[in-house]
UniProtKB/Swiss-Prot annotation:
Signal keyword on record: yes
InterPro entries attached to this UniProt entry: WH-like_DNA-bd_sf (IPR036388), WH_DNA-bd_sf (IPR036390)
Taxonomic lineage from the root: Archaea, Methanobacteriati, Methanobacteriota, Methanomada group, Methanococci
Sorted UniProt keywords: Signal
Signal peptide positions on this chain: 1-33
UniProt protein name: Uncharacterized protein MJ0773
Length: 175
């Protein structure tokens, strides 16, 4: 019984499902299956398992079943898989072979995040993170002297900054 919570985060696809539910807040198995392009049965059975382990709560809305996280479930997931809470979770997939991360299984444009940037008046750059609905999540600043600051994490070293440093180097190399 102690091993069961570890099974919830045992595969990258299960982590993608949990990441999707975390971003959306609540979800139906049907919308999960459509957006991640997986079978409805897989989504439904996995969400039922999470519900049985009290990681998610299951509610009826008419003839549909709605799933959302419980506070206990969020605490368990923060301990077992803290990477799914990071908005740059898609960077986890950079280490996997391309066949496993095809957009068929993980459409980042639907459940990931977008980044826009602009130069400020002092010569620095402001990187803004947006979720898939276009809501502003936070900013990361890079000064003209090369110092970084993440408003989201209130830190100068985090996954957001690491991701943006790689992106910034890639963009500089293209110029």
């Amino acid at each position: 019984m102690e091993r069961l919570p570890y099974e919830i985060v045992s595969t990258i696809f299960r982590k993608a499902i949990l990441h999707y539910v975390l971003i959306r807040g609540t979800t139906y198995p049907q919308s999960l299956a459509e957006n991640l392009n997986i079978s409805k049965g897989l989504a439904s059975s996995f969400l039922r398992l999470c519900s049985a382990l009290n990681i998610m709560k299951r509610e009826r809305a008419g003839h549909k079943v709605l799933y959302s996280f419980t506070s206990k479930g969020l605490a368990i997931l923060k301990r077992l898989a803290p990477e799914i809470f990071d908005l740059s979770f898609s960077s986890v997939f950079e280490q996997l072979p391309k066949k496993k991360i095809a957009t068929k299984y993980y459409p980042v444009d639907k459940i990931g995040f977008e980044i826009s940037w602009k130069e400020d008046k002092l010569g620095g750059i402001v990187f803004s993170f947006f979720d898939s609905n276009g809501e502003h999540l936070g900013d990361v600043f890079r000064s003209n002297k090369g110092y970084w600051w993440c408003v989201i994490c209130q830190s100068d070293t985090c996954k957001h900054i690491d991701y943006l440093k790689r992106l910034y180097k890639t963009l500089k190399n293209q110029d």
